[in-house]
Amino acid sequence: MIRIVYTLMIAACAALAMPLSSSAKDGELNRAWQNAVLAAVDSFPQNGGYYTGRKSTPEFKKSAWRAFNEAYNMRLADPRPNFDPKKATPSFCSLATYGAFIQALLIWDTDGKISRMAWFNIKPLVGITDVVNEKGLNQRDGEGCWGRANANGPGFAVLVAELKAGYNFTAFRGAKTEALRESKDEKYLTDEQWCKHSIWAEAEPGDFMKIFWNRNETAGSDSGAIIGVDDNPAAEQEHGHSVVFLGYDDNGDVKYWSSNGPTDDPVNAGYGIASCPRTRIQRVVFTRITNPENFDRAASKMKFNNLNKWLDALNGKRHGTTKELLKECGIK
């Protein structure tokens, strides 16, 4: 079991004006929910394997999809799932954070605010036939709750915005290459400017976080400026990570929990705490849930095939823009 020590920043970072950023709303923090997220993270096993494939292998007898389906454990007559994080192995990042969300919602919902039908629609449909998914349906990116959370771009942020369960805030360091800049005024912030950006002081442990990796120094790629995956196999594409934000370590590096991979040793990868310098992040979207009771709206508003067309387009059709990201995430 993971035991987390949360180290917060001692001093607030200085605010820095930046065209492509938004702020957290002062005072809007549901402490009971944030604590539920941290308790949920603590309930997951350590490691368990990192695997995105759908077929069994000598290393992984079950896929992450099948394992998560078994971990959800909900029968037709059940009012809510009996979710078991220890069964949800192996895993990958978006499945890990979605699992943490489910576990947090179960911990928080002590008086049945989330209806049985909402729980049915929150369940990921991953192509496996069971009593809830009788037809063995598989939600593609942008479909229903899981299809949104698993999508390229800020999928989970879009889900929260659509259900009005919280709000999102974001910052973008800017594109380093002129070809990927969306306006003539767009600048690529220096390391010092980016590390002092006000967004780092606004984040709270228990926020969900979508990282767009900065690969300019490590891979000579400006892909951190890209949202989604287009139809050109030769083009640069999004490289991201879905995580739960935990605070900062003693060096001021971002500390987070997720299923972390791929690695050279996938069997011993998976769930755990990791950290990275702020300079490794080129764009970030934080999601703060303030009204978890509104996930009950999934009962009527998130049927299994309810499609967000923008997230669907980010899966092999076209890249998104910052303007679109702000709109879809409800950021003004």
Positions of the model-derived regions?
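Mature extracellular "passenger" or substrate-interacting domains of secreted, surface-exposed proteins
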Residues: 51-52, 205, 310
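Positively charged n-region of N-terminal signal peptides that target proteins for export
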Residues: 1-5
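N-terminal capping segments
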Residues: 23-162, 320-332
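...with weaker cross-activation on analogous glycine-rich loops/strands in unrelated enzymes
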Residues: 119-264
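Short, solvent-exposed coil/turn linker segments
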Residues: 14, 185, 190-193, 198-199, ...
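Bacterial N-terminal signal peptides
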Residues: 7-17
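Low-complexity, Gly/Ser/Thr/Pro-rich intrinsically disordered linker/tail segments
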Residues: 253-332
